């Protein structure tokens, strides 16, 4: 399932700014509205705990992937402002609910000693799938000359095929600890909540501001954006597992201090950059720091009551999106 997400989301994200500008005639105002709408399902991620009354977490994850894939598949068919808003919301519901459940299941199933390394491997698998996606996008636009619609359909369709495979090949994983089916907010988790809030702010700068900066200010094409994403994914594939191992050695505190110190430097540089090459370098460095967020998850795994994990994963995503 880790490999299924980038097939849709990387397709959607890579094409978004160019599709919005070239087909739906978006300006910065519409992009801002779209990104706000995209974050609403993330803001409501706490509600995933109520689905546990009806579905198992594994089932929720698969249904979420179906929504993610469907939203991506049909995006190119609706090249209007309202159409792009609607398909984005569908895609976003699937993406955010899947990510919430993926975090929950990972922290429940993985041993604490091996969690950083395995989470790094999960990132690496997703990065590999992203590389394949970026290569397909580059071939589709630069060599074959396809339009946005079939490329969106290929990305979403590939995710649906993986979901079908998962349903057949992995019908059931046992539940180790029964999870709470109500919202959990505990005072002793305050530092985790604070880190989650900061993580949401940095994510918005990367996804919303930096990506649009590349297209609007520096005129990056679909192919050029794909190359940037390709570089980011290659670095993750090569180093995410090693970063996970390193976090297991140096500890979560040292990793998080290094991450946020580096991000301060990158964000200040964003404010003054006027060179397309320098901006691209900052974009790559910015993305590289995402792998260090493993430390935040494993920190919570160490301090949490095991029965709190599912509910807390939803609450954390909501806090992340408040910022």
Give the positions of each predicted feature:
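Short amphipathic helix-loop junctions that connect adjacent transmembrane helices
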Residues: 14-29, 208-225
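Intracellular juxtamembrane helix-capping segments at the cytosolic ends
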Residues: 16, 97-110, 291-304
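Helix-to-loop junctions at the C-terminal end of transmembrane segments
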Residues: 44-57, 141, 239-252
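Structural signature of the two symmetry-related core transmembrane helices
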Residues: 60-73, 156, 254-269
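Helix-loop junctions at membrane interfaces in 12-TM secondary transporters
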Residues: 76-87, 271-282
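Cytoplasmic helix-loop-helix junction between adjacent transmembrane helices
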Residues: 89, 93-124
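Glycine-rich segments within core transmembrane alpha-helices of 12-TM secondary carriers
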Residues: 119-135, 319-323
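C-terminal membrane-cytosol helix-exit motif in multi-pass small-molecule transporters
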Residues: 137-141, 156-175
